[in-house]
Amino acid sequence: MRVGEALVAGGPPGTAAEPEVVIGELDGPFGTAFATLIGNQIKGHTKVLAIMNTDVMVKPATLMVSKVTVKDDKYTNILMGTVQGAIANGVLDSVKEGYIPKDRANDLGIIVSVWLNPSVSNDKNLDHKILFDIHRRATTSAIKKAMNNEPSIDWLLENQDSIVPVSYTHLRAHETLRY
């Protein structure tokens, strides 16, 4: 089993992508977890297969799980339209680039935990092309990291003291000192 994540930003507000992926063999414990997720639907967190179109499932079989509780139809349409297509294309890009061996496409499965900013529902000027491209790149990057075991434990240990979480840096910049 392999695990990876990526953060890709750089577009308009609300278009950043932060997928987390788990990749494993479909005929083992991972496959059991994959099937259980499909069968265990929860309101607001529907799990769906990543598809290229209404009846063209991507390979390796990829299950999308939303990190955000889905509450409205517009958000659902963006998640199950633009982002679903982007994830499917990111998976195929990973096969094309050799991160996932083509001859393993029927044996492996991918679970993608998807972050889609809820603000997209209210963006009247949402650029679906930018949103698509960012989620596609983020999916490919997360899969690449997973399949290449990145970052390595050696790199993490070497850089541990110089890595500062973005959220922490942002909070520190706005912190008021109290004595």
Residue ranges of each PLM-predicted region?
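A short, hydrophobic C-terminal helix/tail in secreted or cell-surface proteins
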Residues: 173-179
